[in-house]
Amino acid sequence: MAELTIRPEEIRDALENFVQSYKPDAASREEVGTVTLAGDGIAKVEGLPSAMANELLKFEDGTLGLALNLEEREIGCVVLGEFSGIEEGQPVSRTGEVLSVAVGEGYLGRVVDPLGNPIDGLGEIETSGRRALELQAPTVMQRKSVHEPMETGYKAVDAMTPIGRGQRQLIIGDRQTGKTALAVDTIINQRDNWRTGDPNKQVRCIYVAIGQKGSTIASVRGALEENGALEYTTIVAAPASDPAGFKYLAPYTGSAIGQQWMYEGKHVLIIFDDLSKQADAYRAVSLLLRRPPGREAYPGDVFYLHSRLLERCAKLSDAEGAGSMTGLPIVETKANDVSAFIPTNVISITDGQCFLESDLFNAGQRPALNVGISVSRVGGSAQHKAMKQVSGRLRVDLAQFRELEAFAAFGSDLDAASKSQLERGQRMVELLKQNQYQPMSTEDQVVSVWAGTTGKMDEVPVADIRRFEKELLEYLHRQEQGLMTSIREGGKMSDDTLQAVAEAIAAFKKQFETSDGKLLGEDAPSAAK
């Protein structure tokens, strides 16, 4: 019988090999907290000492929360979703992630919630990645000056407060003054650029609806679809029925989707409708989290809430891809008071504002643009050269007309020059009126404004101005298509071009019949005397 020998070296080697190759079963080390308070869309959580600011927390029913307050003993978080199932004592776990949203071309033509989930019933969205909501805006060296036009299709805006790609232009005014209409028409006006298929002309649009009625959001979507603009537009919807947390986050979601396209070298237009309601939602969340209130009960960082959002709109340098994101934030005022807290904050952040006035709106002037306090600080360098050429005197002429109109209201006798100026001003005011969902092309605006400011419409009755303009532009597109194309594609108009436009207008006037049955051509000799 063979003798059993035990070799200590073999046993030692076997033990060493086993120890070195041993891998324990993956033991999950997870911090688990407890809900101590829940309600009104917020929750207080104890027992997560390593949680980060703006980290996502997961509740027992799968609902997510966003950590906003990191206090000594507990965390104050805003619940992202339905909060009725969250109760005291329930466990809460960390996710180790910050809030992000899926991005990509699949968002075009879709309606999504503030977390990027589709809510239009058209199935899942094909995405190309994810982007964090809280990202730094482009630095100074990554930017370039605004120099390309972003036309709204409104003569009053494009002539007097022009907007450039990468600019932040505030639309401000009381409720029911046409703010959303101006923004939606700007989206519709990008339709012809989109259909060219040229990436340098195409503009992807994002409409962020914050605290709007569901019916209003549906009507905006319907208007975009009816006018062929939904195919290049994304709607981020946080209706009035959504929790305050969603209304606070919606603009950042839209901005993240747009930034992805901007950094890919594409052009984006984003509309925030409206930031007053976002500030109200943030105030509600902050007060529920016991943050100290400041002016008008807003928290101390409400300026930063909007500045870090709007600073993301930029025109990138060529080295960064030359993309752009143009922002049109909307702010609602009370009784035309632009000196309130939120309006003054956003005015100081943006590059200009279009002030829409309820008195002008009710008087039938639409868009109801108050020329006196509306301004574009950087858009002048981006304005189409032909438009800049013809609109130079428009603002001054209108301001003088308003002053003269107020003076004439006293019934004073006016000299012939003042009467002439008053009559031309009335025609210019009528000329600047436009119907909703009917934005005008650049060449049509240029011809229309030039004809008005140079007195080519002085003999047209005020009641016939808009019909004269419509029929004149139809005549020019029919008879002088080459001339209209040269205005659109060229820069500053030459003397020959201006002469050709003047001759075409003169030829049309001879065949235009006024509402009282007269031909303008018949009155021309007497008007010249």
UniProtKB/Swiss-Prot annotation:
InterPro entries: ATP_synth_asu-like_sf, ATP_synth_asu_C, ATP_synth_asu_C_sf, ATP_synth_F1_a_nt-bd_dom, ATP_synth_F1_asu, ATPase_a/bsu_AS, ATPase_F1/V1/A1_a/bsu_N, ATPase_F1/V1/A1_a/bsu_N_sf. It catalyses: ATP + H2O + 4 H(+)(in) = ADP + phosphate + 5 H(+)(out). ATP binds at G173, D174, R175, Q176, T177, G178, K179, T180. One of its GO terms (cellular component) is plasma membrane. It is a peripheral membrane protein. Its EC number is 7.1.2.2. It is an enzyme of class 7 (translocase). Its main location: membrane. SUPFAM superfamilies: C-terminal domain of alpha and beta subunits of F1 ATP synthase, N-terminal domain of alpha and beta subunits of F1 ATP synthase, P-loop containing nucleoside triphosphate hydrolases. GO terms for molecular function: ADP binding; ATP binding; proton-transporting ATP synthase activity, rotational mechanism. It is found in: Cell membrane. One of its GO terms (biological process) is proton motive force-driven ATP synthesis. Gene3D superfamilies: 2.40.30.20, ATP synthase alpha/beta chain, C-terminal domain, P-loop containing nucleotide triphosphate hydrolases. Keywords: ATP synthesis, ATP-binding, Cell membrane, CF(1), Hydrogen ion transport, Ion transport, Membrane, Nucleotide-binding, Translocase, Transport. The record marks S374 as: Required for activity. NCBIfam families: atpA (TIGR00962), PRK13343.1 (NF009884). Produces ATP from ADP in the presence of a proton gradient across the membrane. The alpha chain is a regulatory subunit. F-type ATPases have 2 components, CF(1) - the catalytic core - and CF(0) - the membrane proton channel. CF(1) has five subunits: alpha(3), beta(3), gamma(1), delta(1), epsilon(1). CF(0) has three main subunits: a(1), b(2) and c(9-12). The alpha and beta chains form an alternating ring which encloses part of the gamma chain. CF(1) is attached to CF(0) by a central stalk formed by the gamma and epsilon chains, while a peripheral stalk is formed by the delta and b chains. Belongs to the ATPase alpha/beta chains family. This is ATP synthase subunit alpha.
